[in-house]
Every structure is written in C-alpha cells, then in structure tokens.
Amino acid sequence: MKAGIHPEYKAVNATCSCGNSFEFNSTLGKESIHLDVCDKCHPFYTGKQRIVDTGGRVDRFNKRFGALSSGKK
C-alpha cells in the first residue's frame, strides 16, 4: 500500500433516536453520527410491524369523497 493516500480508519460512535448507541470503525470524517432507526427499534426486527396502507388509492379516495358523490346525481 502506498503511504499517505488512504483515508484514516477510526472508531465512530452511532447513536439512535431510541437511545441505543454502538461503535464501529469507518473512514467517515466524523466522530459520531445520529441514526433514525437501528436494529433495536426498527419495526421489521422488533416484530411490531404493522400494515400502514391496507387499502389502495381508490379505497382511500372513496373513503374521503364517497359521501359527496352518493348524495346527488
């Protein structure tokens, strides 16, 4: 390896919005980063996954404006 051309590889502290923090090695220029989700709070990994959109766009439209169109013709 050539000297002086490779970025410095150092420890980085990552803190999640849930409060979980862990350390990893990276060439990132920062000493710490903030994450929105991690494996401790992500719905897929926690098993608390929920279906956000059960209906389609047409169902959502009919739910919002169905009462308006059914009254007059």
Swiss-Prot record:
Gene Ontology molecular function, alphabetical: metal ion binding; rRNA binding; structural constituent of ribosome
GO cellular component terms, A-Z: ribonucleoprotein complex; ribosome
Cofactor names: Zn(2+)
Cofactor binding description: Binds 1 zinc ion per subunit.
Keyword field contains rRNA-binding: yes
InterPro entries according to UniProt: Ribosomal_bL28/bL31-like_sf (IPR034704), Ribosomal_bL31 (IPR002150), Ribosomal_bL31_A (IPR027491), Ribosomal_bL31_sf (IPR042105)
Single biological process term from Gene Ontology: translation
Keywords (A to Z) from UniProt: Metal-binding, Ribonucleoprotein, Ribosomal protein, RNA-binding, rRNA-binding, Zinc
Highest taxon of the lineage: Bacteria
Gene3D superfamilies xref list: Ribosomal protein L31
Entries under SUPFAM superfamilies matching the protein: L28p-like
Residues that bind Zn(2+): C16, C18, C38, C41
Role of this protein: Binds the 23S rRNA.
Family recorded in the similarity comment: Belongs to the bacterial ribosomal protein bL31 family. Type A subfamily.
Subunit structure: Part of the 50S ribosomal subunit.
HAMAP family listed in its UniProt record: Ribosomal_bL31_1 (MF_00501)
Stated name of the protein: Large ribosomal subunit protein bL31
Source species: Vibrio parahaemolyticus serotype O3:K6 (strain RIMD 2210633)
Origin organism lineage: Bacteria, Pseudomonadati, Pseudomonadota, Gammaproteobacteria, Vibrionales
Gene designation per UniProt: rpmE
